[in-house]
């Protein structure tokens, strides 16, 4: 099989108790091995991305690319699904374990759901977390969320990350370097509120 796109995931948090937890260095070695294997098969993707493509795009569907790279709004469908727009996030009913029958009886997935209006910095945190899957962030998308220049808002953080080779900057794009990917949790958290 040679699918058009490949995605590499770490174990989800609900699976962590079933398997031994690898160190950051072990996960980095595992990713490096997979990266070399996947790119050796002809797939394209920057080091630090978890999506790869034979066609040389981001390896994402247009929906995911809009959501992850362009800070697009999205509507989650289904019980406990998350939705996001330019003012906040919301969760459909069912996240606290209501039965499917109970949820269907309500005739909507919005009634009884949780909605949160978020300040720009918290919305930015969501964008950073989502775009981190691709190992890159767009400063123009960040500016749209913050309503101010992220180069000024995060001047110290960007200076530190660039000067220490954790990220690279190309136009409005920020890319994790291999060194930054090794510490991606710490790198991304510098942009959280």
Spans of features found by a protein language model:
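Short, amphipathic alpha-helical interaction segments positioned at domain boundaries
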Residues: 181-193
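Short, Lys/Arg-rich nucleic-acid/phosphate-binding segment
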Residues: 50-52, 171-174
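A short, conserved structural fragment
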Residues: 162-172
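C-terminal scaffold of the Radical SAM
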Residues: 1-148
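Basic, amphipathic "hinge/linker" alpha-helix immediately C-terminal to the N-terminal HTH DNA-binding motif
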Residues: 120, 174-181
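Short amphipathic alpha-helical interaction segments
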Residues: 148-162
